């Protein structure tokens, strides 16, 4: 094999590795698609991918809601919290992964906050108790959220053995965080259907005392 041929084969192999994908579909106990479920793909026994710098995200406040309500970001991401409402908000979190409080404000008063620890961060507003949001922070570069069909495709996953974690605030308590093992092939995609054993918890209504009770 010539050096040029070896180089071409190496480049092709690298391209194939980058093209690998993980397709996850999540359904509930009634076989209905689960929207907005967090899906994270983590390598098993391998070194974690180096952290990237300059990662940014935005969680707006619109119509007394966090938009998006559920976010998933990589550790080290800077998140901005603009207030697009005509009323002021006071965003806070008591979660160990990010404990903070932004004093009463409107517009874009504060610089972005860096979410530098992995874990689940629950957001609230001291003025409007019905406002609840979630930020899932992960060390893995491979993550996403399911769409209205309960599907998410996570691309550029190298071949190997992985642990797939799933989370959603409406998962039943005994399925609060689901884990599955998955092997990603050298070529082609890896498919992972996940069917919940329990029904999703009810969608929270406008009653602030019942909004995501337990979070």
Regions found by a protein language model. Name each.
Residues 4-5, 23:
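Generic extreme N-terminus detector
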Residues 5-16:
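Bacterial N-terminal signal peptides
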Residues 19-215:
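Extracytoplasmic copper-binding redox domains, predominantly the cupredoxin/blue-copper superfamily
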């Amino acid at each position: 094999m010539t050096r040029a041929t070896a180089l071409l084969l190496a480049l092709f192999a690298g391209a194939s590795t980058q093209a690998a994908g993980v397709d996850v579909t999540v359904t509930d106990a009634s076989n209905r698609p689960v929207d907005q479920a967090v899906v994270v793909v983590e390598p098993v026994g391998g070194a974690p991918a180096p952290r990237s710098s300059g990662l940014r995200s935005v969680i707006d406040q619109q119509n007394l809601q966090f938009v998006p309500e559920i976010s998933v970001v990589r550790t080290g991401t800077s998140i901005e919290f603009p207030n697009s409402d005509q009323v002021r908000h006071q965003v806070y979190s008591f979660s160990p992964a990010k404990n903070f409080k932004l004093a009463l404000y409107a517009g874009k008063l504060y610089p972005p906050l860096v979410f530098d620890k992995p874990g689940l961060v629950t957001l609230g507003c001291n003025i409007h108790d019905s406002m609840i949001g979630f930020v899932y922070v992960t060390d893995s570069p491979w993550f996403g959220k399911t769409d209205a069909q309960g599907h998410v495709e996570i691309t550029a996953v190298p071949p190997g053995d992985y642990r797939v974690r799933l989370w959603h605030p409406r998962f039943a308590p005994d399925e609060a965080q689901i884990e599955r093992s998955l092997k990603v092939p050298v070529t082609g995609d890896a498919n992972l259907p996940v069917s919940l054993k329990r029904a999703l918890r009810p969608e929270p209504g406008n009653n602030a005392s019942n909004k995501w009770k337990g979070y």
